[in-house]
Structure formats: structure tokens, C-alpha cells
Swiss-Prot record:
Region (Disordered): 42-91
Basic and acidic residues compositional bias, start-end: 76-91
Protein name: Protein SPATA45 homolog
Bias (Polar residues): 51-70
Superkingdom as given in the UniProt entry: Eukaryota
Similarity-based family: Belongs to the SPATA45 family.
């Protein structure tokens, strides 16, 4: 009885292994699963000569960078109350 279980397990293991090998060889169109250098050699990226240039590590530029406080003014703005209809009662 134990011999029969062992052969069944080994057959199952072989089937799984064959299935795994066959599925790994199937062509995938997903760029994540393909060659890791494919993104760099892709033909549609080659048309732009500055496509891979980066300005992250360059020095400070002369351009003004807006801060989140640039919109603040010295005096607060006051708005008069706007009413759609004139006062109906005059007491």
C-alpha cells in the first residue's frame, strides 16, 4: 500500500514539474516578466534623444520655485456681503 502511494506522489510531482516547465516557456507579452533590459532597448523609446536625461542630481537652478506660502498677502481680503434679493422689510 505504501509503495502505491509513493508512485502516485512521484507521478503527481512529475506532472507538476512538466506543467511548470511548459508554462515557464510560454511567451508572455507582459513587460514585467520579460527581459529586465527590454525597457531600455525598446524601439519606441529610442526616438527621443533626451528621453532618459534626468535633472535630479543637477545643482540648484535659477528658476523661482513656488512655495506654498507665496499666495499669502500682507493684508487679508475683505468681501462685502452679497445678497441676491434686496431687503423686503424695512424696520
Amino acid at each position: 500500500m505504501k509503495e502505491k502511494q509513493t508512485t502516485t506522489i512521484s507521478l503527481t510531482y512529475r506532472k507538476v514539474k512538466v506543467y511548470f516547465v511548459n508554462t515557464m516557456n510560454i511567451e508572455s507579452w507582459c513587460t514585467v516578466e520579460l527581459n529586465s533590459k527590454q525597457d531600455w532597448t525598446r524601439a519606441d523609446r529610442k526616438h527621443d534623444p533626451n528621453g532618459f536625461n534626468s535633472s535630479v542630481f543637477k545643482g540648484a537652478s535659477n528658476q523661482h520655485q513656488e512655495s506654498s506660502l507665496d499666495f499669502a498677502t500682507a493684508e487679508p481680503e475683505f468681501h462685502r456681503e452679497r445678497r441676491h434679493f434686496p431687503e423686503k422689510s424695512e424696520y
